[in-house]
Amino acid sequence: MTKPLPLEVKRSRRPTSRACKFCHFKHLQCDATRPCKNCVKRNIGDSCEDIQRRKYGSNGTKKRAQSAQKVQSDSPSASSATNAGTSAVNESKLESSELPMVAQQTQQTPRGLETIPTIPHPNAENNSSFLSPTTSQMFNTGSNTLMDQLKMSVPENNSMYQHDTLFQPPKKYENNSYGYVNAAPQGQHMFYVGYSEPGEQRASPDAEKEPGTNLNSPSSYLSQYSHTQSHTNSQLTNSPSVVYESEIAKQEELQLTSFVEAANNEELDFFDMDFTQRPFIRLLENNTMVSSYPNNSTPKFFDHSRSHGRIPNTAKEVPTEIQQDEEFTPPLILRHIIKNPDDIYLTRVVKAYQYPKAYHALTKYLKTRFERTQLIEIAKCMSKYRPSFISATKSLVENDLIFTERSFQRSLLEYESLISMSAAPTIIWRRTGEIVALTNEFSVLTGYSRMSLLSKRTFIIELMDDESVVNYFKLFSSIAFGDLNATLLTNCVLRKAAQDDYLRCACVWTIKRDVFDIPMLIVGQFLPVLD
């Protein structure tokens, strides 16, 4: 460590304009002699030389300054701002005196939005007063062409954004008697219910004309809401420009409009309604069902599927003896063997699953059940995703297939423990449609025993009517390689174990994928739709 110098030595030294390298690095006071006293004292006088300083404005600094000046001179915004500076100041004085509210709104504009051009409303009359004469002339000449382009690109009912739909009802189901759950018009998302952002407030045109209206008060908000709803409903029903591409969407919109109009005309008190008169189904702890229908049954849905009643119900059949071969092991046997995660890796029962054999069995069942026109429609859906499954598994070795099957059985153990704590009737099946697990609530609701569904190769489509099967393949083909965490809300008609007995259900399908992003299993939860 350098000792402090005496006061006499400090006064005798004169500071120099350029230090040596050592003094500059050590932050010491250097002198004009070379070698300096600090270097001589440390026996490094041979290396004492002046530090080379970089000149100001040389190399990069000068080049950056020149490039910045060139960019400023080349930019049109700088030249236009310089030329129109005086006129903008004069116009701002006039605008601040005539339109103080506009000036306040301009000052509160968030950063990053100053460069976004504002398109004047085509119906506004006083928009020219907001702009300078040059800008006003530019908007007047170009606004017509721009608004025509916007009208061509945006539909007339532009309050609803168009999305790529995941659930579009086919034309075959337009006259379906039981319809779809949350079936949106074609071109809209299936979950669209007129959603708006949480922080967004939509007021009626009357509220815009009356600045003194307080939208935060309940009475004014309800009046504005009823006015907006009635105005929207009248536009939907009376506007001839609304074109429905689907009959189901049209009927749904008309029913919704009539319901809203009836609710606005008649003040209903929902707290005075007698909820005991509503239909219900209750599952007891002893695995029995109690409902409001005669003989504790479920509502009948047989009129729309008379052709399906002629096909024997193979799902309820229980084999006399469980047949086990090398290519297929019934899920009931696997459930008795695999009871904890260690059994998956220690037993030799878990092998590579034969998905081609499963698809062949599925094709054989479809040919015995459906007609040619329906088979062609199902085949088109299966052709969209079956080659992808084959190409994805073609490069996998035997150990990879064993690994995917072990992952399937491990995930199935977790899902079985999860659905056992849920009161919703739940059933799990493979991507081929083979049922692998179900809850007691599902057995009570449909009448199928665990023995009948898990002791043989049973497909989930055996529990559905014809129209629900076609709809199932259409939906599955659309999400097979879509969202990695796909959850689908739809409805279907389940075929119960009793003869000619059907049950309409709303269902939620959750798809679980393996490490190769291929659908591994589907968890379906069903709730009956009561009339």
UniProtKB/Swiss-Prot annotation:
| Residue ranges, compositional bias (Polar residues) | 124-134, 213-238
Q: Which CDD domains match?
A: GAL4 (cd00067)
Spell out the residue ranges making up region: Disordered: 56-134, 197-238
Asked if the Swiss-Prot or TrEMBL record annotates the protein with the keyword Glycoprotein, the reply is: no
**Residues in PAS domain copies:** 411-483
Q: Where is the composition biased (Basic and acidic residues)?
A: 199-211
DNA-binding region(s) in UniProt: 20-48
Q: Which UniProt keywords apply?
A: DNA-binding, Metal-binding, Nucleus, Transcription, Transcription regulation, Zinc
Per the record's keyword annotation, is Zinc included, yes or no? yes
Q: Where in the cell is it found?
A: Nucleus
Name the UniProt record assigns to this protein = Glucose starvation modulator protein 1
Organism (species): Komagataella phaffii (strain GS115 / ATCC 20864) (Yeast)
